[in-house]
């Protein structure tokens, strides 16, 4: 009986202890949930009350909570401080604690890997890339049983290597990710990894590897049956790569079917409902880009195509649409990719403005690019060479040849991109040709490096055609007219094959000029009239000015007084428009940008008293 009584007493004590423990746990849970609720209320207030949110989360620690709650609270604090404050030191401390504690807790993957992901982001922001890499590698190593996080961390480390310009390591990681996705049965995420790898291979110009990869991607995308928005977004990614591949190669005509498919694809996406995607396979929980970002991207590649083809009014129309969409998006979204899209759009429309005779507007837009680059060192690093190239083109348009040379030389120093290098050298050579005998040795060296008959450095059809044009221009200025005609006919053949309208117009008018000098007025007229028509269609103000002057002189020589008078009137109108624009551009304070050749973009510009450049070339 005594034993039974003792057992009963023990059982009662145990039950009492268990009840006390349960009550304590319930109380702990209630205070924790209360603090968490307050913190979330303050975080989501309008405007957010971040200081109060942080106080509520910090109040968790004096209660000596269990490890799970402690680790999660450190993660929440680190996340709030990282995203909403500039206190990176405290954010780092909390995230490091979350990562350390969570590794000791079994089945705590979400907290563990989110802490690793955020912490590596913070390290990169602080330029501690060497701390971010091993952290991500360890997280990747221990996340193989968690498909979503394993894929996400692989993408993150690949992106880090890409930002460091280590594309080989990035491609290797994306290859690992593609194979892992295949093993866990996620064809969708496998396609994302492969398309990302294809994008990097295009950047590296490894075209022999790109073609089979894109073919495989095309098959995977077409065969995958899943959420319609995810499927269409894969198709957009695939088609964007194809279109940019064609445009990089200067194949403006060949790209049209792909571009049309891309435009139809984005129209399809815009009609689909944004239902929340909840795939059964956790490895499928990825999305390439938001729908709105994809729309801007399709506008962007359409602008690139229109610019290369010489449909400048169309380029203007799509740029306006894209910039309007970007302004709306940037009110709600601070994603860095939006600023990149904006800069690339502005770079293209600036070139359009310079061709259409709107130099003052182009200069103000160059200044806008400078301001965007001032806000982001990475953006400036990626676009500095393009910015100096645009300034060089502006300098040519206002006849500041010494400044043009300085800008192009600076751009060459800042780029290792082959296509951009060839574009800059082609334009620099044209500056030296116009300058006469001042730079003969340098000019000969440049022309040899972009010799389209022998070892042209890039595969771009458009740039090779432009190199033939520059050789023709040089031969014309040297008085070697037969040689000039051969080069220009080669340009015409290549530009006609791919609908490169600006090159066609420039080649026709220069051929017309050669025939005029040689006294072959009929053949000259046969070149100049279509050049004028094409230049009006683009519209290209410089070619129109040149063509109208030639038509005036041709008609005078042939005794066609009325036609000569009409052409003279056209020439006068074009001259006045260009002269007025020239004066306006050179009077802007931003015109001082032409002297900037070193360091980050200047913050302010001093206003000038008036233009200080020669107008002789316009009259």
Swiss-Prot record:
The UniProt record lists the keyword Nucleus: yes
GO CC, any one term: SMC loading complex
One BP term from GO: mitotic sister chromatid cohesion
Disulfide bonds: none
Sequence intervals crossing the membrane: none
Tissue: Spermatocytes and oocytes (at protein level).
Superkingdom of source: Eukaryota
TPR repeat coordinates: 113-146, 385-418, 465-498, 505-538
Region spans: Sufficient for interaction with NIPBL: 1-121
UniProt KW keywords: Cell cycle, Cell division, Chromosome, Chromosome partition, Mitosis, Nucleus, Repeat, TPR repeat
InterPro entries the UniProt entry points to: MAU2 (IPR019440), TPR-like_helical_dom_sf (IPR011990), TPR_rpt (IPR019734)
Family: Belongs to the SCC4/mau-2 family.
Subunit text: Heterodimerizes with MAU2/SCC2 to form the cohesin loading complex. The NIPBL-MAU2 heterodimer interacts with the SMC1A-SMC3 heterodimer and with the cohesin complex composed of SMC1A, SMC3, RAD21 and STAG1.
Function: Plays an important role in the loading of the cohesin complex on to DNA. Forms a heterodim. eric complex (also known as cohesin loading complex) with NIPBL/SCC2 which mediates the loading of the cohesin complex onto chromatin Plays a role in sister chromatid cohesion and normal progression through prometaphase.
Protein name per UniProt: MAU2 chromatid cohesion factor homolog
Taxonomic source organism: Mus musculus (Mouse)
Gene this protein is translated from: Mau2
């Amino acid at each position: 009986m005594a034993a039974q009584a003792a057992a009963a007493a023990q059982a009662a004590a145990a039950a009492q202890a268990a009840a006390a423990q349960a009550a304590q746990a319930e109380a702990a849970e209630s205070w924790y949930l209360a603090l968490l609720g307050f913190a979330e209320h303050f975080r989501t207030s309008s405007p957010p009350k971040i200081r109060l949110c942080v106080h509520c989360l910090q109040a968790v620690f004096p209660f000596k909570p269990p490890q799970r709650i402690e680790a999660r609270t450190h993660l929440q604090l680190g996340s709030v401080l990282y995203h909403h404050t500039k206190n990176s030191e405290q954010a780092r401390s909390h995230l490091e604690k979350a990562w350390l504690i969570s590794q000791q807790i079994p089945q705590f993957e979400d907290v563990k890997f989110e802490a690793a992901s955020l912490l590596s982001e913070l390290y990169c922001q602080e330029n501690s890339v060497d701390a971010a890499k091993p952290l991500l590698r360890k997280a990747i190593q221990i996340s193989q049983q968690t498909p979503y996080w394993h894929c996400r961390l692989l993408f993150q480390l690949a992106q880090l290597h890409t930002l460091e310009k280590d594309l080989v390591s990035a491609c290797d990681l994306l290859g690992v990710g593609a194979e892992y996705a295949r093993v866990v049965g996620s064809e969708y995420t496998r396609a994302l990894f492969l398309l990302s790898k294809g994008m990097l291979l295009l950047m590296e110009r490894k075209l022999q590897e790109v073609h089979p990869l894109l073919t495989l991607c095309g098959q995977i995308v077409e065969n995958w049956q899943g959420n319609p928005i995810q499927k269409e977004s894969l198709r957009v990614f695939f088609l964007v790569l194809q279109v940019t591949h064609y445009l990089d190669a200067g194949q403006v005509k060949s790209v049209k079917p792909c571009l049309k498919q891309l435009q139809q694809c984005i129209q399809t996406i815009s009609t689909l409902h944004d239902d929340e995607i909840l795939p059964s396979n956790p490895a499928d929980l990825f999305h390439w880009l938001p729908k709105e970002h994809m729309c801007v991207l399709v506008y962007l590649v359409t602008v690139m195509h229109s610019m290369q083809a010489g449909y400048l009014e169309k380029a203007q129309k799509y740029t306006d649409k894209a910039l309007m969409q970007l302004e709306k998006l940037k009110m709600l979204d601070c994603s860095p990719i939006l600023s990149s899209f904006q800069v690339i759009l502005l770079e293209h429309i600036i070139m359009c403005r310079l061709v259409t005779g709107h130099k003052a507007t182009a200069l103000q837009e160059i200044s806008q690019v400078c301001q965007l680059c001032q806000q982001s060192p990475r953006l400036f690093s990626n676009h500095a060479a393009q910015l100096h190239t645009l300034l060089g083109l502006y300098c040519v348009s206002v006849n500041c040849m010494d400044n043009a040379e300085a800008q192009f030389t600076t751009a060459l120093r800042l780029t290792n991109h082959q296509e951009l290098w060839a574009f800059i050298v082609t334009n620099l050579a044209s500056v030296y040709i116009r300058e006469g005998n001042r730079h003969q040795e340098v000019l000969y060296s440049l022309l040899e490096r972009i010799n389209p008959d022998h070892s042209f450095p890039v595969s771009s059809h458009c740039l090779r055609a432009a190199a033939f044009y520059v050789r023709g221009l040089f031969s014309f200025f040297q008085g070697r007219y037969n040689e000039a005609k051969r080069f220009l006919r080669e340009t015409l053949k290549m530009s006609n094959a791919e609908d490169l309208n600006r090159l066609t117009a420039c080649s026709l008018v220069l051929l017309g000029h050669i025939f005029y000098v040689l006294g072959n007025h009929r053949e000259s007229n046969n070149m100049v009239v279509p050049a004028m028509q094409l230049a009006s269609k683009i519209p290209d103000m410089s070619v129109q000015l040149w063509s109208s002057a030639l038509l005036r002189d041709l008609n005078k020589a042939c005794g066609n007084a009325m036609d000569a008078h009409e052409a003279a009137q056209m020439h006068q109108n074009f001259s006045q428009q260009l002269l007025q624009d020239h004066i306006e551009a050179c009077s802007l304070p931003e015109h001082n940008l032409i002297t900037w050749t070193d360091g980050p973009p200047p913050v302010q510009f001093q206003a000038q008293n008036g233009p200080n450049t020669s107008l002789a070339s316009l009259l």
